[in-house]
Amino acid sequence: DELNPALSTYGLPLGDAFQMRDDVLGAFGDTAITGKPVGDDLREGKPTPLMAIATARANALQLKELQLVGNQDLTPAQIARVQEVIRETGALDELETVITRLTDEAIAAVQHVPFAQSVRDELITLAEYVSWRTV
């Protein structure tokens, strides 16, 4: 019973960090590494924290360019421009900061779980992989 809160304190932020990393990879991932077409999530118009931040911070011209998101026929040039707008708005940097914070929260939670140090080390390794994965 005492493990449930500690493991939840580890797992919940790590799950959020995993999903946010997936959102970044869906918008910026390298096809050769991820196996998914570049900008696939942009073509699909998936509502993600990355797009929410970019949209909230975008100026009028950038908003117009972000309206391309969800168009299945986005060209590589249009995808590159949307990616540029996401970077310009600071959305990518902000999401990276949030991923780091959530990962740090998960790692800190592991320190309080009554497991052998080797198990804690494995959980920390998992957290670091999840947050910085490229696939």
Question: Where on the chain are the PLM-derived regions?
Answer:
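All-alpha prenyltransferase/terpene-synthase fold signal
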Residues: D1-V135
